[in-house]
């Protein structure tokens, strides 16, 4: 790596850009994004500022910086420039979504508003405290005191059409419809899979469940999520122990930056968890699930872990079709 020069992308959603000011390429700082460039001799300084990122070397190769070490990958010229353009488009969508939420909050009261009926009735939820509003679908059971399943979609279904989350969760509610349980399907606003927006969305999910007018068994609330939704499930179980009767995070993770010490693992022991992941998942790394599954087993927690070595970031469909996750959830109940 002698005499190499590196470039990488920094994002204000994940780190403070100010310390990188001396390295920012001219004209590349926009909407909380910046391209930085530095020599190999400055690599130690960058390591102290960034925990994990991708670097593009002047030799045309991609390098992975992770926890202070650097690993050379394949030849990928202009990969950082392409990433910068992609995330600029992403930020524009995120800003439009934030502006829409701000407009909605300015003339909407707190709580649930029904938009239309049907098998999966459409609603809008406004949470002034967490400064967020989003649509959701709800299927009420014909019988009282039935369990509630909360299904959280992946990042690809974010938006405001109140439809994408239905298709994203299709393998789940195909299994659940025959149980005649209550089913809740929120749709996360675009851009709520990172930073403060993600935390606001996560907290508002719990508030929405609290405010649902349906007559369901509050000792049997089950939460299931895929990818981004799986990450939300881990966070909800951590933030609200002894609230959910069981949780199924699939292809998610509680601590993707691997700074495990910042979480009190004892909070996770209080909820039965069935995690599922594939070791070849390159979208959401398996490390966090590996760590917490092992640690929770040591503590004697009610933890199941399905760990596959193929299917990558598409393993959720097969998991939902072939594993008895619904029956497992229904066997759990809060005391």
Task: Name these PLM-found stretches.
Residues 1-33, 38-39, 51-54:
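N-terminal accessory nucleic-acid engagement/regulatory domains that precede
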Residues 85-148, 181, 236, 292-293, ...:
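A domain-start/cap signature at the N-terminus of enzymes
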Residues 193-227:
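Gly/Ser-rich "nucleophile elbow"/oxyanion-hole loop immediately N-terminal to the catalytic nucleophile
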Residues 148, 152-202:
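Active-site machinery of serine-nucleophile hydrolases
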Residues 276, 282-293, 297-335:
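C-terminal catalytic histidine-bearing segment of alpha/beta-hydrolase fold enzymes
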Residues 32-105:
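Solvent-exposed alpha-helical segments and adjacent loops
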Residues 219-266:
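Primarily recognizes the serine-hydrolase "nucleophile elbow" in alpha/beta-hydrolase
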């Amino acid at each position: 790596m002698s005499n190499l020069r590196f470039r990488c992308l920094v994002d204000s959603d994940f780190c403070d850009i100010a310390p990188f000011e001396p390295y920012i390429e001219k004209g590349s700082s926009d909407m909380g994004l910046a391209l930085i460039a530095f020599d190999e001799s400055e690599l130690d300084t960058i390591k102290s500022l960034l925990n994990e990122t991708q670097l593009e070397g002047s030799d045309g190769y991609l390098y992975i910086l992770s926890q202070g070490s650097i690993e050379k990958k394949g030849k990928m010229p202009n990969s950082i420039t392409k990433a910068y353009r992609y995330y600029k488009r992403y930020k524009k969508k995120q800003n439009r979504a934030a502006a829409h939420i701000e407009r909605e909050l300015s003339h909407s009261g707190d709580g649930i508003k029904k938009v239309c009926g049907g098998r999966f009735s459409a609603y809008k939820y406004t949470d002034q405290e967490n400064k967020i509003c989003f649509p959701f679908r709800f299927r009420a059971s014909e019988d009282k005191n039935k369990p509630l399943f909360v299904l959280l979609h992946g990042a690809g279904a974010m938006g405001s059409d109140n439809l994408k989350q239905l298709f994203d969760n299709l393998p789940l509610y195909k299994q659940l419809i025959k149980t005649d349980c209550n089913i809740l399907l929120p749709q996360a606003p675009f851009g709520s899979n990172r930073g403060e927006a993600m935390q606001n969305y996560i907290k508002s999910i719990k508030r929405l469940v609290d405010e649902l007018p349906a007559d369901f068994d509050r000792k049997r609330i089950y939460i299931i999520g895929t990818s981004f939704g799986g990450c939300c499930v881990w966070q909800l179980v951590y933030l609200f122990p002894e609230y959910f009767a069981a949780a199924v995070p699939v292809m998610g993770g509680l601590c993707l930056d691997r700074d495990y010490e910042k979480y009190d693992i004892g909070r996770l022991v209080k909820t039965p968890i069935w995690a599922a992941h594939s070791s070849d998942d390159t979208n959401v790394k398996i490390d966090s699930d590996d760590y917490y599954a092992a640690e929770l087993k040591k503590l004697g927690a009610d933890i199941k872990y399905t760990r596959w070595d193929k299917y990558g970031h598409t393993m959720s469909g097969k998991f939902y079709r072939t594993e008895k996750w619904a029956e497992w959830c229904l066997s759990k109940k809060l005391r």
